Design a protein with these regions (language model features):
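PLP-dependent class I/II
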Residues: 1-163
Length: 163
């Protein structure tokens, strides 16, 4: 049985509905039957691979975090803007663009829709990628797209300095 929790949530308005109770019972039963956690380990490995694929594609460095759940990855564009180009470039970004510009442009260029992290109590200029539901190749496209966007903004900034 496959059930998308978002679809289940859309099917009711409040409280635990029968589909949710059934789904939770099936998940709990499956967890009890899989004593060696084979499925769980396989899914954790898949998420881990997607996380590293995303970050390797950006060219940015993924810092170790023992508390990382791995379901989402947040990339703070201002951190990487500062690291690669300095504080003046960060100020240029803040003055000339909005935090949502990056995710809109990413959607236009890659046809992949991500959310900015500001709505999830993350840094305003961060991009939030779910690691749970896309193919490995999609994370390559996302990572390369994020890096390309940052570098194209830097190119515009450098051109503005020459004027």
């Amino acid at each position: 049985m496959v059930a998308d929790s978002r679809q289940v949530a859309l099917s009711h308005t409040a409280g635990l509905s029968l589909p949710q109770q059934t789904q939770m019972s099936l998940f709990a039963s499956f967890a009890l039957l899989d004593a060696e956690n084979t499925y769980k380990k396989r899914m954790q490995d898949m998420i881990h691979e997607r996380l590293h694929t995303l970050w390797e594609s950006t060219g940015f460095t993924l810092l170790d975090d023992p508390l990382r759940a791995g379901y989402y990855s947040e990339i703070d564009m201002l951190v990487w803007a500062k690291k690669f180009y300095g504080d003046d470039f960060v100020e240029y970004l803040k003055k000339n663009y909005e935090p949502l510009d990056v995710v809109f442009r990413l959607a236009q260029e890659t046809s992949l829709v991500l959310l900015n992290g500001g709505g999830f109590d993350a840094p305003e200029w961060s991009i939030r990628a779910s690691l749970a539901n896309l193919k490995r190749e999609d994370y390559v496209r996302i990572g390369e797209g994020i890096a390309s966007i940052l570098h194209s903004y830097a190119q515009r900034w450098k051109e503005s300095l020459d004027k």
